[in-house]
Amino acid sequence: AYQCSADIIYERGYPVTINAEDNTHFAAEAAEKVTPGVDRDTPPIMAGEDFSYMLNKRPGAYIMLGNGDGPTVHHPMYNFNDDAIPAGCSWFAEMVETRLPSVG
């Protein structure tokens, strides 16, 4: 129809998700300012993540907020722990406030 054509490149899976060391360190330091119990010794995981496309363009870090014991995020029995919201919001606010220049 309409004499159009398209070339499609379909690739299965995602690129490897690799955190930039300095961004990971920055995120951990920010977390330690707002909450106790930051685990810097979390073992690497082999997860497919579309965020890896962003990390291929700009340095960054795929960071995780602890949510207690129980099923993980993609499990059908997963239940987000609302008690983690204040710590998570404070963590992100700390990173933003630290990185952005103050105005005024």
Predicted regions and their residues:
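Metal-dependent amide/peptide-bond hydrolase catalytic core
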Residues: 1-104
